[in-house]
């Protein structure tokens, strides 16, 4: 998603936000998906990719991989003005710094590659 406003504007990132009240990370993810792209029904499977604590130890970040059956046109909210379906190795730029760090991690790339290979095997 291309961020259109706020302090992190003009960068490409993922659906995201802060959990509200007593929300679990999973509940927060579902709510943020609905708020930012409009629909969770297209998601076949959701897999945790990574969790990490911010440098100041104030925030615990969770990143998930959501597998969809088919690409779709998201209903973007006012936070975003664009979206892209990308190949595994060709990401739009500039990336949000957190997403860039996630995608530079060899562990995360290995996890993503395994999931994509598994999906391709199952779909053939």
Show which residues each predicted segment covers.
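A small-molecule sensor/coupling module
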Residues: 98, 104-109
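Active-site-adjacent beta-strand/loop module that shapes the phosphate/pyrophosphate-binding cleft
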Residues: 50-73, 79, 84-90, 106-108, ...
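A generic structural signal for short hydrophobic patches within well-formed alpha-helices
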Residues: 19, 91-94
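Short aromatic-enriched loop/helix-cap "lid" or pocket-rim segments at secondary-structure transitions
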Residues: 12, 97-98
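N-terminal strand-loop-strand
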Residues: 1-14
